[in-house]
């Protein structure tokens, strides 16, 4: 059964939306409108000119959790944008999230961005930028935008049959099983995975990879379900600031943000097949992550894609949307969900 506390809190969030505490621009900008504004945004960023996209006065911009003026940060050094653009559109609330390949000063990067659109103008901008030097750990190594090619995986682009489309709350609940399962994972809270589930992080597959010759299997060699069932990711000690920001009901997509905290107290752990996983990083750290979940017609997580970078331990994402998942009343230490 899905977490009732998450359900209750998300219903509270829905009520806040109804009162206008969230994006007020839903309904007057459909999918084509939102995607067009996203493309304009990327073109304006490469041109280093905010005037080339409709940005409302007072719009707040953050890059990797830090508030910056426009144009600054990536807006000053972006040199090109590639064809790869994975878009998640939420016309009901006037939000769009997208992943894109780009370059800064000629070096390849990955960009995750959420835009709030009100009256056909951008009113919020939240970006996570993974540079080629942002390690994601293990054999995946550095961010590899080249692996993504020119188009997203087809599952992200297909509309679900009308009878298979789900409500916002159910989609949030399904996506949340992933983060609930990964926190201190011991294989006891399995997410709702489809058999064909695959995950890409910073351009590298982190599931279903072939085992290198002469090497022992690790978490990235298993399917999504197998890796969770075995108890990998046990050192992900706290998943906080879970925000389900863009819900694309037509395509079954959830665009979300989270902080993966590692408190560095776990130096090794043993998974269910007897393999011992050693943790090489010695200091606490956090992954700042924007993640897209594709939920299939059976209501299971089929595809996962993430853009992430390492940030100081406990760093805030820089935003408070009003919905906190998990519910603060369900926390043991101010952050962690009680199972």
Listing of model-derived features with the role each one plays in the protein:
Residues 1-9:
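Bacterial N-terminal signal peptides that target proteins for export
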Residues 10-19:
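Bacterial N-terminal signal peptides
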């Amino acid at each position: 059964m899905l977490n009732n506390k998450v359900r209750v809190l998300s219903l509270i969030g829905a009520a806040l939306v109804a009162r206008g505490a969230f994006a007020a621009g839903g309904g007057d900008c459909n999918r084509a409108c939102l995607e067009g504004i996203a493309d304009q945004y990327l073109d304006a960023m490469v041109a280093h000119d905010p005037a080339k996209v409709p940005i409302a006065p007072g719009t707040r911009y953050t890059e990797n959790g830090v508030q910056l003026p426009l144009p600054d940060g990536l807006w000053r050094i972006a040199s090109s944008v590639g064809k790869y653009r994975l878009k998640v559109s939420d016309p009901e609330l006037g939000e769009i999230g997208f992943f894109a390949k780009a370059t800064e000063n000629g070096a390849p990067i990955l960009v995750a961005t959420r835009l709030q659109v009100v009256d056909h103008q951008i009113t919020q901008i939240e970006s996570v930028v993974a540079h080629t030097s942002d390690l994601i750990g293990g054999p995946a190594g550095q961010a590899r935008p080249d692996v993504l090619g020119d188009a997203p995986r087809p599952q992200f682009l297909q509309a679900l049959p009308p009878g298979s489309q789900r409500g916002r709350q159910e989609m949030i609940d399904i996506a949340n099983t992933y983060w609930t399962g990964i926190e201190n994972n011991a294989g006891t809270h399995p997410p709702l995975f489809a058999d064909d589930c695959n995950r890409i992080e910073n351009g590298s597959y982190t599931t279903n990879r072939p085992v290198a010759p002469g090497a022992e299997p690790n978490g990235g060699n298993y399917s999504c379900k197998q890796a969770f069932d075995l108890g990998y990711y046990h050192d992900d000690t706290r998943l906080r600031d879970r925000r389900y920001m863009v819900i694309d009901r037509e395509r079954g997509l959830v665009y979300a943000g989270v902080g993966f905290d590692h408190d560095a107290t776990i130096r090794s752990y043993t998974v269910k097949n007897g393999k011992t996983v050693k943790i090489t990083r010695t200091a606490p750290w956090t992954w700042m992550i924007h993640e897209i979940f594709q939920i299939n017609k059976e209501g299971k997580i089929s595809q996962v894609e993430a853009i992430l970078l390492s940030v100081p331990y406990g760093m805030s994402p820089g935003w408070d949307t009003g919905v906190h998942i998990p519910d603060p009343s369900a926390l043991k230490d101010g952050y962690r969900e009680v199972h």
